A protein has these predicted regions:
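Conserved, well-structured ligand/cofactor-binding cores
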Residues: 1-472
Length: 472
């Protein structure tokens, strides 16, 4: 008796299976739970994905109702169930592992079963009484995993991209703030880790901000590719079992529901196995990761020391740095951001291999593409938010040390090139390097320039921008 209350029995092609009595999912979801213990990350860990598939199912039921395929009562109950999921309800009923075989069939059926069973409850029936509302005949009407799954992925990625861009915008603002705060702080620019010419921290931090703004534009360019969908193509793009007009009306309904501009692919047979949009978007994430990792490398290098490194900036101390070396504090926030960037770059390689592995009319490797993209987006967003709040906003600059390094640098001799010529400047630089004396003292001692001329030429602030030049 207790056993009967804890479980209900459902059946499918492979036979009967016990399902928890209170679960909104059914037999095919239970098989997915039993089969896949891979990533230990489920749909529950990706609420944007659950919401996305509910939007797709809502657009589909509205389309089928408008075309006279499903009656008012069933379509109304299914639509209500979808809206509840979109509002955040019933998400615990999506326990399927994100990495799975079957090209996402377990995910699609998980959604179909949850929606069907919730619709049954709304209509006053028992869960599992599928004669009144079927996961396949009603919730999946005119659809296939092969159009529902990729469309849901695309919508989820669009939603997650918005979160990522928001985090990036915050990081850019933080760099702009620091650029303003230290606009007058002079430092030595370096190329190949050798002294180059002076610059300001305002220029350095603004360059980081501008660099990242380019990445927002690149992400937005690539996310547009995700707005082409194959809903209505059903199994392989031929539209079998979808009524005429379903594809375009479903895209229009999905656009209206989400506020996004979705369009039906021109060739649904071509679109069904195509993963090019995922590859392009992942490439944009990789490009962001490469640039962000470089910025973190710079921050760690500029903060090196405190006595025997550059010690140009101070990063906020976040944790004791060693179990054996007293007083050591490490740049842990840039370090963790670096590691996230490595992960995103690696995920891009996984996505490339999975995209290449498609065969004929379908790419069955979409689950690993999906999980890799979701992981990259989630990790990157979290890392950027952490970098912003726990590191960038707390950066301070060691102005006096930076100025002393500029003043004593051999690199400032570059500013004398237009005045005394490259050859003479090279001799001054060589002597300064060999003797340890300053460029300033050597030029004055040898009478190459007057003190007044030299003071003006070697004013660090004058070296931060271009000037009118007349060669003698």
């Amino acid at each position: 008796m207790v056993e009967e209350k804890k479980y209900r029995v459902e059946s499918d092609l492979l036979g009967e299976l016990k399902v928890p009595a209170e679960a909104l999912y059914g037999v095919q979801t239970q098989r997915g739970i039993n089969n896949y213990h891979i990533s230990r990350k489920t749909m529950v860990d990706n609420p944007d994905f659950i919401i996305a598939i509910a939007f797709v199912k809502l657009a589909a039921i509205e389309t089928n109702h408008s075309l006279g395929v499903i009656n008012d009562e069933i379509s109304g109950a299914i639509a209500q169930a979808c809206r509840e999921i979109i509002e955040g309800k019933w998400h615990e009923n999506f326990p399927i592992d994100m990495v799975q075989g079957g090209a996402g069939t377990s995910v699609n059926m998980n959604a179909n079963e949850v929606i069907a069973n919730r619709a049954l409850e709304i209509m006053g029936h028992e869960k599992g009484d599928y004669q009144y509302c079927s996961p396949n005949d009603h919730c999946n009407c005119g659809q296939s995993t092969n159009d529902v799954y990729p469309t849901s992925i695309r919508l989820a990625l669009i939603r997650m991209n918005t979160h990522l861009v928001g985090a990036l915008t915050g990081l850019i603002s933080a760099f702009r703030y620091k650029a303003d705060e230290y606009s007058d702080a002079i430092k030595m620019g370096r190329t190949q880790l050798q002294d180059a010419v002076p610059m300001s921290f305002g220029q350095e931090f603004n360059a980081y901000a501008n660099n990242l703004e380019e990445e927002i534009l690149n992400l937005e360019r690539n996310v547009k590719l995700l707005h082409e969908i194959n809903m209505g193509g059903t199994a392989i793009g031929t539209g079998l079992n979808a009524v005429p007009g379903f594809a375009k009306l479903c895209a229009a309904n999905l656009s209206k529901l989400t506020g996004e501009n979705f369009e039906t692919a021109t060739d649904l047979v071509e679109a069904t196995p195509d993963t090019g949009a995922y590859v392009s978007y992942s490439s944009a994430l990789k490009r962001l990761a490469v640039k962000l990792s470089k910025i973190c490398n710079d921050l760690r290098l500029m903060a090196s020391g405190p006595r025997c490194g550059l010690n140009e900036i101070n990063l906020p101390p976040k944790a004791p740095g060693s179990s054996i070396m007293p007083g050591k504090v490490n740049p842990v926030i840039p370090e963790v951001t670096n590691q996230v960037c490595f992960k995103v770059i690696g995920n891009d390689t996984t996505i490339s291999f999975a995209a290449e592995a498609g065969q004929l009319e379908l790419n069955v490797m979409e689950p690993i593409i999906t999980e890799s993209l979701f992981e990259s987006l989630t990790w990157m967003k979290n890392a950027i938010e952490t970098l912003t709040s726990e590191c960038i906003l707390g950066i301070t600059v060691n102005k006096e040390r930076c100025y002393e390094m500029v003043k004593n640098s051999i690199g400032i001799v570059t500013a004398l090139n237009p005045i005394i010529g490259y050859k003479k400047s090279t001799k001054v630089a060589k002597e300064a390097h060999e003797t340890g004396r300053s460029v300033y003292d050597i030029v004055i001692e040898q009478g190459i320039m007057s003190k007044e001329e030299l003071d003006k030429a070697l004013d660090p602030n004058e070296m931060l921008q271009s000037h009118k030049l007349t060669l003698k």
